């Protein structure tokens, strides 16, 4: 028993020492120097990457969303969003967690922006909570919410962090969902454009980079095809229709995006000199075999994923594969809508994390029509017994750096090489790792090094990519996973909300501060 007690005490001292070292490296002034061995190990292993590896003016930043980091969900005049309603359903979120407080960036924004600055980042891609500005979606303004975003934007500019503002990250005001069905109703187009215009008018003198929606495909598919995200609708759910609703919602999202862009271009862009675009997620799909069927399945998967939104925005119509398969269930654009939608971006953000193999899978007589079954394809995560890549904590996230190269190159070749930036990229660890374990995130360092190397290769091969945003600065509320997933460069103790920079934070500091 004596020997065991000594071992336990030694382990406790080691963990406490690691935690103290990490804590000393964080604080209101950001990263203050070293975190002992972790910093030494991170230093000098950027894999030959530096700022000079990328074009002049290339932007490095981090990304987050309002619902995941702000907290103050029920205070200072903010109205509930569909996610506030969704998390109240027992069993929907791991451990029945909520984002009522999350990492409290609402009060700690200076600390977090200081951390970004100390890491050498140029920009912060944040989102504005629609229901914090308009608690019921339209009408009366919540000026306390406006004041918060003014404080955040002004502080970022004060210390040299460029704001990239996203107008919608999954968090529709619940009042609009209750009033007329939210995104299923065409009224949402004008409501969103009104909200967007208020933001342009209020913040556009300082914000010069706008995004309308983050991952509209996720909004439509997970919210209305399988019901895993708010508002939780699907054919097998309490309410919904997986065969039609995802396409209706996507159509309204595209029109909402284009309507907001139209207002910005007609009324504000020539004065404010800003740019506007949209953020699209893109898993790379690789045919399982070289068979014609599997290669066609891979192309359909790309069409139903990124093409669902980017094809209309670039070419004014849905991909041919969607038109052929979905038929009358796919809404159509009028001539005026085509004119509004086509070309409605100054740039596009690509959120890229992973890649899958796919094989052809044609529906049979028992297959229920749905967005997911319309792909006529099945994702496969290994080939000949070999996984496509190591898996992170999330069951959907495999580490496949070559997928990023192929995704960026595909956007370049398929869509006329639009100006783009990598608007999200990262991996997660389990939520229950200790501080000492969490800050020693060697797998995340290797992930970023390999993915950013592939991004550089794509740029060297001609992709017009102007920036990169890591997801995310902080561990935070990860939607269905609650606090059981950690994507941050900075470890957050969810009990005390203290921030502890991880090895990956020092790695990024070495990368973006290096001029060689």
Swiss-Prot record:
> Gene3D superfamilies this protein is in?
Glycosidases (3.20.20.80)
Glycosylated residues: list them. Answer: 96, 290, 364, 432
Catalyzed reactions per annotation: Hydrolysis of terminal, non-reducing beta-D-glucosyl residues with release of beta-D-glucose
Q: Which residues form the signal peptide?
A: 1-21
This entry's Enzyme Commission designation comes to 3.2.1.21
Q: Which Pfam families match?
A: Glyco_hydro_1
Q: Where does a beta-D-glucoside bind?
A: 68, 169, 214-215, 353, 424, 471, 478-479, 487
Q: Where is the active site?
A: 215, 424
Q: Which UniProt keywords apply?
A: Disulfide bond, Glycoprotein, Glycosidase, Hydrolase, Signal
The disulfides recorded in the entry are 234-237
> A Gene Ontology biological process annotation?
carbohydrate metabolic process
Which GO terms fall under molecular function for this chain's record?
Answer: beta-D-fucosidase activity; beta-galactosidase activity; beta-glucosidase activity
Enzyme class, UniProt record, top EC level: hydrolase
Family, per entry: Belongs to the glycosyl hydrolase 1 family.
Q: Which PANTHER family match?
A: BETA-GLUCOSIDASE 1 (PTHR10353:SF330), GLYCOSYL HYDROLASE (PTHR10353)
Name of protein: Beta-glucosidase 1
Which species is this UniProt entry from?
Oryza sativa subsp. japonica
